[in-house]
Amino acid sequence: MKKIKCALIGPGNIGTDLLYKLRRSTVLEPVWMVGVDPASDGLARAREFGLKTTDKGVDGLLPHVAADEIRIAFDATSAYVHRDNSDKLTALGVKMIDLTPAAIGPYCVPPVNLDAHLDSAQTNVNMVTCGGQATIPMVYAVSRVQPVAYGEIVATVSSRSVGPGTRKNIDEFTRTTSGAIEQVGGARKGKAIIVINPAEPPLIMRDTIHCLTDGPPDVDAITASVHAMVKEVQRYVPGYTLKNGPVFDGNRVSVFMEVEGLGDYLPKYAGNLDIMTAAAAATAERFAEQMLAATAATA
C-alpha cells in the first residue's frame, strides 16, 4: 500500500519516540529526521533506521521536500522556532503537525475535534501539550453533558522524561494548555499546572482533572461520558487508565488518570511523551488517509 512520506524535526525525546510509532504506521513513511546537533543521538538512531538526516535545521531539508515527496512534517523542537519552521514548509505545501506549545494553528485533541480539522483546509494543527492530551478529553467528557464554568488540570511527570525543550517552554505549556481547556475542552475558564517530579525511581505520569459545573452535576450521565471517553483515548494510548472517579463533591467533578507509555524510546513511566506522540501519529494517519483517498479519486 502506498504511504505518505513525512519528515520529523527535532531528534530529542519526543521526536525519537514519534519515529518509533511512525515506523509501525500503515499509511505514513518517515523519510527525514532534522536536527541541529551533528552528535545528536536521535539523528544517529534515525540513520540506523534508514532515514535521511540533516544537522542544518529545516533549511537542510527544504531542497529535498519536492524530490522526496514530503507531505507531512512533525515539529518536535521548541515554541520559539516553530513559526519559522512552519512558514518555510507550509509554503512548499507540507502539512505541519506541531508538537510544540507554539499553537499558531488550531488545537487538535483527536477524540474531541480531529474530525473537524479533516474537513478544513488547515496547513498547521497544534497538538497542545502532553498535559493537554491527557486531560482535555476528560474536561470535554464533562462539558458535553453540561456546561463547565471552570476546568483545572494538574499534570505530574517524571523529571527524567522532561527534555530541555519542554523545560524552556514551561510558561508556554501552561498558557497553551489553559487555552485548549477552554477552546477544546469546553470550560469557560481553564487553568493548567505542571509538576516535574524528580523522584527516583521515576513515577508514571499522573493527571488530576477538576471541573466545576453549572448547577448540580448529572452523576450518571457524566460517569458514562467519562468512561466512554477513556475508551476513545485507549484506542491510540492503551496505557491511558482511569485510576479514580469521577468523584462528585457539590458542583465539583474530579477525575484521576494515569498514563503509561508503550516503552518505545523511553521507559513506560514516560506516558507524557507517549500520549503526545501517539496523538500526533493518530492525527497524521487520518490526514494521510484523506490524502491517499484524494489521490485515488483523481487517479
Curated annotation (Swiss-Prot):
InterPro entries per the record? Acetaldehyde_dehydrogenase, Acetylaldehyde_DH_C, NAD(P)-bd_dom_sf, Semialdehyde_DH_NAD-bd
Q: Which reaction does it catalyse?
A: acetaldehyde + NAD(+) + CoA = acetyl-CoA + NADH + H(+)
The catalytic site is made up of 130
Any one GO MF term held by the record is: acetaldehyde dehydrogenase (acetylating) activity
A GO biological-process term: catabolic process
Keywords from the UniProt entry: Aromatic hydrocarbons catabolism, NAD, Oxidoreductase
Keyword hit for Lipid metabolism: no
The record's EC number reads 1.2.1.10
Which CDD domains has this protein been placed in? ALDH_C
Residues annotated to bind NAD(+): 161-169, 272
Q: In this entry, which stretches build a coiled coil?
A: none
Q: Which Pfam families match?
A: AcetDehyd-dimer
Top-level taxon of the source organism: Bacteria
Q: What family does the entry list?
A: Belongs to the acetaldehyde dehydrogenase family.
> What is the name attached to this protein's record?
Acetaldehyde dehydrogenase 2
